[in-house]
Amino acid sequence: MNKIVIIGGHGRVGMLLSRLLVEEGWQVTSVIRTPDQYDDVAAAGAEPLVLDVEMADADSLVAALAGHEAVVWSAGAGGGNPARTYAVDRDAAIRSMDAAEQAGVRRYLMVSYLGAGPDHGIDPSNSFFPYAEAKADADENLRNTSLDWTILAPGALTDGPPSGTITTAPDRAHRQTNRGNVARVAAAVLATPATIHRTIEFTDGAMPIAEAIGGLTSTAGA
């Protein structure tokens, strides 16, 4: 049985992904920040692991990841506090990458956002700036690891029933991305080796997810 750990397992994408992977036969460990999130993730079929990644040291992260074949980073500070945003979305994310390498976990899937990167264009006075900077640094660090990484870059997240269809050639005018579609893309990517070393930009669209992801070609450093 494939074993995977989802960091940020109580988030909306993490919960949706847990259910999908359990249905596909994965054994899911769901990393959560507080014990009061335990019952929710257990109900999704995952094994809860209480670990505050903002405060966790390297050894604790290595121990949490050991024995798994893949890790998904779907955690986030949630904005509002720049110091905590850098601590979680950049520093803790990078520690998790180092821990994955030390624990021998090869596959690493990062949930980022459409437009992330050093040229994100967000003004420093904008409250989104710390998040944009943190994600740019974390994504770039991941690209420079030895891991079999994939970065997902969905557009603005929405709720509601997922369409199951996306586009991997998004335009600026149509950037909404259903969280259920993000979870489905993550599951499809984990089953598609050709997505290794890819940054996949996508939004809701017209192509079935399996077809869209299956049509991608692996390009190292993309």
Model-derived regions, located:
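N-terminal Rossmann NAD(P)H-binding glycine-rich loop of SDR-like oxidoreductase domains
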Residues: K3-W26
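Flexible, glycine-rich beta-alpha linker
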Residues: P118, T150-P170, F202
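Conserved Rossmann-fold NAD(P)-dependent oxidoreductase catalytic core, especially the SDR/UDP-sugar
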Residues: Q27-T29, P35, A77-N144, T150
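Structural motif
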Residues: K3, E69-A70, R107
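Glycine/proline-rich active-site loop of Rossmann-fold NAD(P)-dependent oxidoreductases
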Residues: H120-I122, P161-G164, V189-R198
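NAD(P)H-binding glycine-rich loop region in Rossmannoid oxidoreductase-like domains
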Residues: S30-R95, A99-Q102, L190-A194
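Substrate-positioning beta->alpha
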Residues: A93, A134, L152, A173-A188, ...
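Core catalytic loop region at the nicotinamide-binding pocket of NAD(P)H-dependent oxidoreductases
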Residues: V189-I213
